[in-house]
Curated annotation (Swiss-Prot):
InterPro entries: P-loop_NTPase, Sulfotransferase_dom. 3'-phosphoadenylyl sulfate binds at residues 55-60, 137, 145, 200, 234-239, 262-266. The keyword Transferase applies. Sulfotransferase that utilizes 3'-phospho-5'-adenylyl sulfate (PAPS) as sulfonate donor to catalyze the sulfate conjugation of phenolic compounds and estrogen (E2). Can also sulfonate estrogenic compounds, however, the dietary flavonoids (phytoestrogen) and environmental estrogens, like bisphenol A are better substrates than 17beta-estradiol (E2). The keyword Cytoplasm applies. It catalyses: a phenol + 3'-phosphoadenylyl sulfate = an aryl sulfate + adenosine 3',5'-bisphosphate + H(+); 17beta-estradiol + 3'-phosphoadenylyl sulfate = 17beta-estradiol 3-sulfate + adenosine 3',5'-bisphosphate + H(+); bisphenol A + 3'-phosphoadenylyl sulfate = bisphenyl A sulfate + adenosine 3',5'-bisphosphate + H(+). Expressed in liver, kidney and jejunum. One of its GO terms (cellular component) is cytosol. One of its GO terms (molecular function) is aryl sulfotransferase activity. Coiled coil: none annotated. Its EC number is 2.8.2.1. This is Sulfotransferase 1C4.
Amino acid sequence: TALHKMEDFTFDGTKRLSVNYVKGILQPTVTCDIWDEIWNFQAKPDDLLISTYPKAGTTWTQEIVELIQNEGDVEKSKRAPTHQRFPFLEWKIPSLGSGLEQAQAMPSPRILKTHLPFHLLPPSFLEKNCKIIYVARNPKDNMVSYYHFQRMNKALPDPGTWEEYFETFLAGKVCWGSWHEHVKGWWEAKDKHRILYLFYEDMKKNPKHEVQKLTEFIEKKLDDKVLDKIVHYTSFDVMKQNSMANYSSIPAEIMDHSISPFMRKGAVGDWKKHFTVAQNERFDEDYKKKMADTRLTFHFQF
């Protein structure tokens, strides 16, 4: 399989993919190189798009959505790993193929994934009136999760120290851009398009309620037993052990789970173990400024 063809792109464990800008948003250079193709992607009316800022519960939501589509059939979800079941539109790793090619080869109905900010979403999704599910996570936990992810994922820039990364994240100089702009852009779009806007913290606190919401949005009718089954199979502890969902099939040269596992904590409030008092004050001040123009609010702890 393509997974094992590493010869055209060799990692020695130190090399990382380079990055560049697309319309002011930092992206891996390979993504920048095919930007026109991504922008011109042709969606189909029955496509379901899952959109998130990186590390906001993407994989979790993908599993839930697929189980809803398949009416709780767990075996169907074990047919292939996450990155093969859900084409990641703007992603390309020379040895693993590209999300675009995957999407084009996939029969309908497709469940697709993107981390693009709303203003960079290929227009065809809106023209075809596709259903889009957006998940937002509080920025403190999101930052911590993204930091650990960049440590283990060679397809993204080296995050440096936690202190350095804290500044990088606040400045929005990470791949897919500023968290603040991302969540606000999708929030502003949600009432004009078929967008279901969910929160990671709600999914944690009351998973059944949120699964029910997704089921209604996808227009499926599932009984209580199936909903409970979906909640069970998409709980953090079960998913962490699921080799088809925990990204353990990606070669270690790209994702090194010994540095930090892909499924690390899946918790709300883990940021308290990372933020110093000074960082927290600085973050809150910055947050207040950047979020002054929106009614969007987040839960930072339970």
